[in-house]
Amino acid sequence: MATEVVIYTVVHQPRRIKLPAQPIPAGATIDDIVRCVFDERMNERYFRKVANTCYYPATDTFLRLVRGGMKLSIGFSVSFLRQAEEWDPALLGRFKELVAHPNVELVGVEPYHNFVFFLDMPLFVERMRWMREELYRVFGKRPRITDTTEMCM
């Protein structure tokens, strides 16, 4: 019979695409392409809604539980981290507090939670290395283990 349980969760917030799509002009910069492709107003709206109904309550619960001895493994998509940095630094601060707890293990996940490993394995490896450094930049901690999107590897 198991005497210990570890909970693993991934925090991911996708970005919404503009509909209808906007044409991308010739010679567009990366910033121009982002403005044409993604609906940032909708992204912010959904982010704030999910933060209030899910991320804050879940983080409060996880903090209470790990302080009581529960062990938690948690991973973050870069998509989520970028949105949290821009729209809710206080929420990111709560996650930093959680990740800093000794009962919490930081897990590396594919940065944008996609299936790039099916298309380009060297790019996947490069992005996973980059993700490791991004997590260190945000949390001051590098993951020792990784997960792939939906554990498909």
Segments and roles (model prediction):
Residues 1-144, 151-153:
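Catalytic alpha-helical scaffold of carbohydrate-active enzymes acting on polysaccharides/glycoconjugates
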